[in-house]
Amino acid sequence: MKLIHFKSDFFKNSLILIGGTIVAQLIPLLLQLYLRRIYTPEDFGAFSIYFNLLSVFIIFCSLRYEAAVVLPKNDVESINVLSLSLLLTFSFGLLFLIFLFFFNNEFCEWVNFPHKYAIYLYLLPFSAVLFSAYQILNYWLVRNKLFKSSAINKVSRRFFEGITQVGLGRIKSSGLFIGDFIGNLANVLSGLFQINRKSKIRMNQISLRKMKFVALKYKDFPLYNLGPTLLSSIANILPFLLINKFYSTDELGYIDLTKMVLSIPLAFISVTISQVLFQQVSENRNNGKSIVGEIKKIGLILLDISILEIIIIQLWAPFLFGFVFGEKYSLSGDFSKILVYSFVFNFITSSFSSIFIALQKIKYYSVWQTFYFVLICSLWFFKHLSLYNFLEVYVTIEVIMSLMFCILLGGIIFRYEKVIKQ
């Protein structure tokens, strides 16, 4: 029996999204060859903090209801989950903008954001709303198996983001921040166009009564998934905020390049696979079918990609970073030899995290996320170490938590398979 059926919908959908993701991520990676020469490491360090903050705030926007768009058996219910998520997102964006209007300077002090870049924080609410809105729309595309449309949107975002960052780069550092905003705007507009063209949403099916109904039906998402997901997101960015606090923004700028390179193909392909897996597992669960086959196939692919990246980074990272981005960035290559293990384990766990939601076992995932946050917070007690040793402690925590994730997920899958066979 062949390991992977290349004609299966699961494989084709994965291939479409992965292909679009790779193209979308090649755009910023190739542009780094130019951007790293016109922006300073300090610019990238500040933008890294900005982007990390954005990744936290988007969790608040829809109270995690967006993940429930795929779950309902009928489209009417799903459309109202989508509408509820968008309503919450715009409400949060408005509140966040008002907060920044009155407390911008205090917020800069709290997150240790360089004051020379403080004006760009006003873009955060707008980018958060756009980013979250597209995530909501993308779940609708995934629900309707419009994976090609989702792939096109990813490319559109990176294309317009890249053009803006290059175009404004010769003027001032604002290009990085404005480029991110323009990219998110392009993503939403492209998503709306794709939905209107291929999967029209009927406005007469939306009502406050129905939104209230789905808000109560899927209340587990804000009650049990919002808090732990927020803690997990903070845990993902906390090590880098601590580096900015304990060491320097310049060093964070070098590590930011390391993160970007290691994230391709790892982080973004994991999101892509997770979305396809989410749709497939949700469908199988609704029909009482096994999910082991898909998980085994994708697991072997992830393992192969991870091993390949580790080998390349360990053998040639400092040389490649210095040769491609400039000699001073060989330091980023040194950092990558340590951080690569964190990224490959995150790659695997992120790809399978949607299974908890699809099987409606988010409480178990929430416990893991909370424990992960607690361990990451312990990094505060290692601030006396050198930067290299600090990174080694961080990676050790990541590996331990990833192994715990695999054990927990394995137990849940085993119980599910046992139930459907009875």
Task: Tell what function each PLM region has.
Residues 13-28, 156-157, 161, 176-199, ...:
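Transmembrane helical elements of multi-pass membrane transporters/channels
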Residues 59-77, 143, 258, 262-287, ...:
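Helix-loop junctions and terminal segments of transmembrane helices
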Residues 8-24, 49-50, 54-55, 59-107, ...:
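Membrane-water interface segments that mark the loop-to-transmembrane alpha-helix transition
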Residues 48-49, 118, 122-125, 151-200, ...:
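Hydrophobic alpha-helical transmembrane segments
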Residues 39-45, 104-124, 315-344:
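Interfacial segments at transmembrane-helix termini and the short loops linking adjacent helices
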Residues 1-6, 116, 148, 152, ...:
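Interhelical loop/hinge segments that connect adjacent transmembrane helices in multipass membrane
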Residues 6-63, 92-93, 97-101, 161-162, ...:
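Signature of the first transmembrane helix
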Residues 11, 68-77, 129-156, 167, ...:
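Membrane-interface junctions at transmembrane-helix termini in multi-pass inner-membrane proteins
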